[in-house]
Amino acid sequence: MEFSAKNALIPGSFDPITLGHLDVIIRASGIFDRVTVAVLANAEKHTMFTVDERLAMVSLAIEDEGLKNVGAVSWDGLTSDA
């Protein structure tokens, strides 16, 4: 992934996504041209939901808010490698 000053990366486990997470995403969408929400997969962390379920929840929240400049991806590497 390539990022510039006009792009933002919001990493997290989102297990599950909360209104607080969504507030940060909405605010970022108003500041940046493109926002990518990275749903982190960490095999060592015990989560309530699978990464696919968390990605689906995040994607649904983004769609429900009508955020056209926001996308969600799953990520299993270091955030610094994104």
Where are these regions (language model features)?
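Nucleotidyltransferase catalytic core that binds NTPs
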Residues: 1-82
